[in-house]
Amino acid sequence: METISLDPEAEDVDLNHFRIGKIEGFEVLKKVKTLCLRQNLIKCIENLQQLQTLKELDLYDNQIRKIENLEALTGLEILDISFNILRNIEGLDQLTQLKKLFLVNNKISKIENLSNLQQLQMLELGSNRIRAIQNIDTLTNLDSLFLGKNKITKLQNLDALTNLTVLSIQSNRLTKIEGLQNLVNLRELYLSHNGIEVIEGLENNNKLTMLDIAANRIKKIENITHLIELQEFWMNDNLIECWSDLDELKGAKKLETVYLERNPLQKDPQYRRKIMLALPSVRQIDATFVRF
C-alpha cells in the first residue's frame, strides 16, 4: 500500500480503490465530514472513534465481517457497508442520527437491532438472505425501504411505516399483495419477479405513481381503477390476455409509461395501436416511445 498523506483540515476524504488493508492513521482528521473507503481490502471497522465530526462513512466493497466500533460516531447520518460479508445487523444502537443505511449484497439473514434508528429515512437491504420483514416498527420516519433479491415470502409488519413513499421487494418469494393498507403515502411500489397471482390489497394506496408488478403470474388487470395518480405501470411478463382489462387504467390521466410485452396480449398484430387507443395519455409502450 502506498503511503497516504491526509490533510488535517479536510472535510471530504476520498480513498476509493487505494488497496487499504487496515483503517489506521485517520485520527489526524479534525474536521472530516465524509470518509470514503470504497473498494479497498479492509477486514475490520476500527480506529474511527476520534472522528466525532463524521457525517458519512462509506465502506462499500471491502471484506468486512462485522459491524463494530462505531459507537462513538453518534453524529453519523449516512453509513454504507454494502458488498461486504456481514452476517448480522448489529453495533448500530448509538447511531441515533442515522438517516440512510445501506447494507446491500451481504449475507444478512435477519432484520434486527434497528429499533434505535428512529431518524432513519432510507434502508437498503437488497441482495441478502432475509426471509421475513420484521423488527422495523420503530422506524416511523422511513421514506424508502429496499428489500429486493431476498427470500421474503410475505408482505407483513409494515403498518407503522406510514411515511413510506418507496417500497421495493422485487425478486423475492411473494405470492400475495397484502399488508399495505396503512401505507397511504406510498408513491412507488416494486413487486416484480415474485409469484403474485392477483392484483389486490391496494385499496388505500391512492397516491401510487409507479406500480411495477412485472414478471409475476397475473392473469387479469383488476382492482386499480382508483389509482388515478399512476404515471408508470409495469406489467410485462405476466398472463394478461383480455384487452378490456386496460379499462382499469382509464382514470389515470397522467399515465405515461406502460409495459405489457410478453403477455398473451402482445400476439395481437394491432398490439401497440390498441394500447394507444385505450390509453391516449401514454407516451411510452414497453421500451419504445409513441410516435404521433
Model-based region annotation:
Residues 4-8, 27-29, 49-50, 71-72, ...:
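Intrinsically disordered, low-complexity regulatory regions enriched in Ser/Pro/Gly/Thr
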Residues 131-231:
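Eukaryotic tandem repeat interaction scaffolds
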